[in-house]
Amino acid sequence: MAMTELTGRIHSLESFGTVDGPGIRYVVFFQGCPMRCLYCHNPDTWEMAGGTEMTADEIIEKITRNREFYSSGGITATGGEPMLQIDFLTELFTKAKQNGIRTALDTCGILFDPDHTEKTDKLMAVTDLVLLDIKHMFDEEHKKLTGHSNARVFAFAEYLKKIGKPVWIRHVVVPGITFRREELLALGRYLKTLTNMEKLEVLPYHSMGKVKYDSLGIE
């Protein structure tokens, strides 16, 4: 009996991304996210029930049609939270690498389990760059902001440092929440310890996602 081909739930695809890693990126927005960040601009990616089922081959075929555009870039998995579908994500990145396409993962790191890294190890073997979102340095504030502790985020950051995986840190600046002196000083001190960090991206808060909240009936 033939094996069922692995599929992922994909929210959307962007063929000309310029802010999700180096060069021009083919950006895959994964469906589903365990966090509920108060400033999230993609609330329509939260629930796993949304999106469209796709195979890795279907996505790779779309990229390779115009692969010359991505010669200095590659594919970026974002979301939502791509690591929520880690098996499919690993298959997608494996096939991308087989086709000579560089890979980047945009993640909040919240699903990393330091006691069980087997699947993460396999994923990192086919991941060229990690874009790690640090939402807030202080745990209680992180819980208020996202609904979760930041312990696993920092555990993931330390794991990436240990394996020497290149990382770009991303931090959204929200006035009165993540743009306080003590929080920024703590962030700066921590980033100095990340020997694998290549870049810090400070992202301004925007309200472009408001229309999505209105259409979804989310306060």
Label each region the model flagged:
Residues 1-30, 34-52, 65-71:
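N-terminal [4Fe-4S]-dependent radical SAM core
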Residues 19, 24, 49-50, 54, ...:
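Residues at secondary-structure transition points
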Residues 43, 214-219:
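Short glycine/proline- and charge-enriched loop/turn segments
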Residues 64-74, 83-208:
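Conserved AdoMet/S-adenosylmethionine-binding subsite of the radical SAM
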Residues 79-80:
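Short acidic donor-binding/metal-coordinating loop in glycosyltransferase active sites
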Residues 207-215:
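Class I S-adenosyl-L-methionine
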